[in-house]
Structure formats: structure tokens, C-alpha cells
Amino acid sequence: MYYSKLILVIIFITSLTACGNKEAKTKETTKTAEVQMPEFQNKGHELVYKMTQETGSYQDLLNLKDIVFHYTYRTPDQKEDVSIESYIFNGELSHGTYLKHERTLPNLKGKMQQGYNGKDFWVKIDGQEITDSSAIESVTFTRKTNFYWFSMMQKLLDPNINYEYLGQDTIKGKLYDIVKITFNTAGDAASDTYQLYINPETHLVDQFLFTVVSKNVTDPVLMRVKYENVEGILLPTYRKYTRSDWEANVLKDAWVEEITKDIKFNQNLDKALFNN
């Protein structure tokens, strides 16, 4: 009997020790997680980080490998580009098969494909490669822009980004935190500027202002977005933009629309698709 009780006591003490070790490990893990929190530049940086906790991070996109979706770009005159977009997130590989191209290289008649393989940009019409420098310049801009607009919210934590918190403002009865974004560029090259309007209730960017310095667009353009949840990632599947001022007032009620649908992640895309 004595030995039985002794064994029970030993088992009880062992279980307490195990629980204590488990608790210690839990505390240690929590502490490690706290240490791994980003070091924020300022409040603006922290707000952008909180936004990515809602939308998903770029690592979440990398985990999903790749994507295929149907994309429409429509200008106020109702002319459209309609394409099947395919991306591999690791390396930002990009490919577009155009069902219609009334805005992008409309002078090139026939079935158009564009691609970026991680090194080179290319374009083909009816299977024939086009090497004209102006066409390649157009494709370079389109491939980069299409990929960036799709993944922008996740990429706002990329390196070489500067954040500035500008305070709060009310737009159409909604309170927003405003964060200015600029980018570190090579040499003395001018940076695009983004001004995010972050909803403090949802932590999402409802709209933003942007410039496109490479196209000499230095006056702000206002972009408004609507999100869709696809496999746990919040994506801005409807976007529209128009001319604005730096107070986000619409200067011209004529909008360019961008519509993303039929989104499919993890399609096991072959990298050969992205080569010319």
C-alpha cells in the first residue's frame, strides 16, 4: 500500500512538472512571438501592418504559389482590355492572354500575349514575337502595373518603403487614418506617392491617392476599392479611379474600372508559360 501511494505521488509530481514546463514553453513561445513583431518606423507603418493582418501578407500569397484570374480594364469611353492573367508569386512572374485589347497596344491586331519571366518582358501577336521598343515599354508597364494592383495591399510591407502618418480626416461621413507612402529609389529618381485612407474600424484601405511619376502623372489620382475574400486573402477585386486633388476630392466624375473575377489560386503553373 505504501509503495502504491508513493508511486501515485511521484506520478502526480511528474505531471505538475510537465505542466510547469509546458507553461514555461508557452510563455517562452509568446515572448519569442513578441520579439518577432516588426519594428515600426512610426504609427503609419503600424497601421499598414495591421491592415495586412486583415488582408493577408505577401507570405500568404507565396504559400498559395500562383494564381489565374479573369481581368477587365475599362475606360470611360467603354473601351476595354480583357485578359486571362496568370502569376507566380515567387519572382512576380506575370502572363496575360488577351481576349480583347482596345486600350493596350490597340494598333497591334490579332491575339496578344504578354509575359515577364523574371528577367525579360515580351509580347506576341498571333504567336509572333514583337520586338519594337515602344511595344516592349508598354508591356513592361502593363505587366508591372497589373501585378502590383492585384497584390498591392500585401506588398505595402515590402522593403524600401517610407511611411508617414498624416492624422485623421472625415470623407463622406467616414473617419479615416491617413498614411503617406513613398519609395526609396535608385539615385535621384523621383518616387511615386501613395496616400492611404485606412478605415479604423475594419483596418482596411477603402481608397487611396497615387501618382505615376514614370508617366508624368504627378497630380493625384483617386482609387476606390472593394474587396473579396478568396481562400482567406482579401483582394481588391473591384477598383475604379479618376482625377482628384490631395484632399481626395473628385475632380472629374469619369472613372476607369478594373474588375477581377474567377480567381483560382494554386494552379500548379508551369514556368514555361512565362517564357517567350
Task: Name these PLM-found stretches.
Residues 1-7:
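Bacterial N-terminal signal peptides that target proteins for export
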Residues 175-274:
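Gly/Pro-enriched, hydrophobic low-complexity segments
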Residues 15-18:
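C-terminal motif of bacterial Sec signal peptides marking the signal peptidase cleavage site
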Residues 25-28:
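N- or domain-start disorder-to-order transition segments that initiate the globular core
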Residues 40-42, 118, 122-190, 212-215, ...:
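Flexible, processing/modification-adjacent segments and terminal tails
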Residues 54, 162-167, 221-224:
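Short structured motifs
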Residues 32-33, 38-40, 45-129:
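N-terminal mature ectodomain segment of secretory-pathway/periplasmic proteins
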Residues 20-22:
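Bacterial signal peptide processing site
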